[in-house]
Amino acid sequence: SAGETLRRLWKNHHYTWGVLTQMFYVAAQIMVWTFIIQYADNLGIDKATAQLYNIVAMGLALTFRFLGTYIMKYLNPHTMLTVFGIGAALCTTGAILWVGMGGLICLVAISAFMSIMFPTIYGIALENVHERDTSLGAAFLVMAIVGGALMPPLQGMIIDQKVLFGMPAVNISFILPLICFIIVAAYGRTAARISRRKQINH
């Protein structure tokens, strides 16, 4: 029954953390792509040019999605998620601390690392889910998109402060996506450890 499936999924911590990680990833993606415009505007870049940076970011995500699929032939998905999560976190740190064009370039570069996250988290979360539970399990992973919409308004509120701690508030606001990417990297690392433990036990 659906109730029994829900109980099994709830007890599967690898899966439940996967759903939460997916939620944080989606939140990060929305925040990065939504607020590139405000970040560029703070540097005195007009909105039309700022939109071009957004388009470049999305193009990077698409390009690296294909590259990531190729690289995954040589690296397992857990390692890929960890490495790309760390890469995204480092770029986000650059976007926070570097006030200027360098920060904007870091912000655009985040999209390259986001490219493989959604399908990779999805696949990893379902690794230890029984076949009879996968339909409902997959549905919750897709529904995590809704949860991801909760954080961007908070980032918008931070940006509205204009200046925080002597820095542009738009830079400080990217601490929220930074937290999300750290969670993504940590999930990849934890999943890798679980996978290795299972291989040793077998």
Where is each model-derived feature located?
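Extracytoplasmic gate region of multi-pass secondary transporters
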Residues: 8-55
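Structural signature of the two symmetry-related core transmembrane helices
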Residues: 79-94
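Intracellular juxtamembrane helix-capping segments at the cytosolic ends
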Residues: 115-131
